[in-house]
Each structure stands twice: as C-alpha cells, then as structure tokens.
Amino acid sequence: GIGSDGLVELGTESQKERYLPRMATGELRAAFAITEHEAGSDAGGIRTHARKEGSRYYLNGVKCYISGGSKAGLITVIARTNTGDTGKQFGVFLVEPDFPGFRIGEIYETMGTKGQPIAELVFEDCEVPEENLLGAEGDGWIAAMKILNNARPLVAARCVGACERLLEISIDWARNRKQFGKAIGEFQAIQFMIADMAMRTEAARWLTYKAAIDSDNGGAAPQTVSMAKLYASECLAFVADNAVQIQGGAGYISGNPVGRFFRDARITRIYEGTSEIQRLIIGRALTRH
C-alpha cells in the first residue's frame, strides 16, 4: 500500500528486514505523510524541513489529513532537505511514533471512511536516525511521485469493487421492490439507470486492469494510472448516487449500506491526487511535444 511502497522501492535490505515482515503480518501499520495545510495538490510547496546534525535528522513541520496516521507504527514522511523554501530537494524518512519530537495533533471527524482515522502529525525537532533515510537526500520528490503513481491503480481497484457491490444491491432491490403493482426493475427508467451503472463499472474495470498490467510489467505511464484512478473514482460517484436514487427514501436512511458507500465514495476523488490533478497529468502527457 501507499504507506509501505516507499520502503519497497527505496529501502535497503536492512530497512526492509526491520519493517516489512511485521507489515506483512498486519502487526505494523504504515502511513504516508506528504500533505500539509498549505501544500495539498501543490506537493512541491511542502514546508516540513529536515535538518541534519551528526548522525541524525531533525524534522520540523505539520502534516495534515493523513490516513491512518494516528494508528501507524511507521510513517513515510516527505520533508524538504534544502535550506530555502524553493526547489524540490526532498528526502523520504521512516518515522516511528515513539521518536522524540513526534506527536499526534488533531484527529479529524470525517464525512465517511469512519474505520480509517485521519490525523494531523506534528514534528517538533523530531529525531530521526540517518539509517531511517530512504535512498539519498535528493530522492524524495521522484520517490513521492512514484509512490502516488503506484497507489492510483489501488484506488481504482477499490472503486471498482465498491461499484460492483452497489450494482448487486441495486439489482436485488429493483427485482424485489414493488410499486404500481410490479417490481420497479420492470420500469424502463430503472433499467436505464442500472444499465449505465453496469456499463461504467465495466469500463472502469478494464481501465484498472490496463493500469495494473502495465505496472506489473515494469511501470505504467503516469497518464495510464491517472485515467484509471480518475475514471473509476468518478464512476463510483455516479454509481453510488444512482444506488441511493433507486432505493428512494430508504436509500437515505442511516444504516442502509448504500448511504455508507455514498459517503465513502467522496474521498476517492480527492486522495492520491484530485480529479483535477489527474486531468492535468493526462492532458500534459498527451499534448507534450
């Protein structure tokens, strides 16, 4: 996942041996921290800074909206390593929650994804041993973009899975819910809604397969994974909205699973790169000379 990908891509054998086995068993949860209050889509604008003194780095700054941040046993942190506020000289650091100078800030109340805490992470001269630097000091920007690139097919796959379940629920409802003396699935309006839900889900599935296959075969082009992530997340928004609509008032009642899907779907167009950023990536790739 996104929390462990930097370790897999850049980690030394010693670093991997120290953390990956416990991640594989579920003993150790991981998180990825790049977003800041003034650096969301503009990831190059991050201000969290790493200062090296002797055999340690000292991190100062605040990361926000970090998925699983308050429960993680290891956090991959992107921090600026140059002395100024410009340029893209970043490092990737493995931070454990018991390192001196680290603390959990605000834990946010969110619209959806209630099972995943979203937290603010505060670094106040947080001491990080130099052996917890991933790669070289200047590797951070390229590493961060690669981590996000690798994560986007996973977001797309989650969206496709949610679409499939919503489609199943909607078909079952259409077959069994009766109005005007017959199942609502016999009405053309409902049939058209379900047809569009199924068509878009299938298209999202094959875009996701394409991104995953290319990634497995040595690396997908950024526009390919952006297409998969963008289309699948927007497909989920469409499918979730229609699933609520098909159930009418029942779909709006708390406790109904379609309502949870509807709330959870919203974040997929934001994290791992907003829909707007995905369109920028795709457009720039296609128009570049």
Question: PLM features: residue spans?
Answer:
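Helix-loop "lid/cap" segments that line or gate small-molecule binding pockets
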Residues: 1-10
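Alpha-helical interface subdomain recognition
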Residues: 10-15, 22-26, 40-42, 52-57, ...
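Glycine-rich, charged/polar anion/phosphate-binding loops
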Residues: 16, 33-36, 46, 62-65, ...
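Short Gly/Pro-enriched turn/cap motifs at secondary-structure boundaries
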Residues: 23, 38-41, 65-68, 82-84, ...
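A short, Trp-centered hydrophobic/proline-enriched beta-strand micro-motif
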Residues: 26-34
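Conserved hydrophobic/aromatic beta-strand scaffold that supports enzyme active sites
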Residues: 31, 45-49, 56, 74-78, ...
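Flexible, small-/acidic-enriched active-site or ligand-binding loops
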Residues: 45, 98-127
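A short core secondary-structure module
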Residues: 56, 60-104
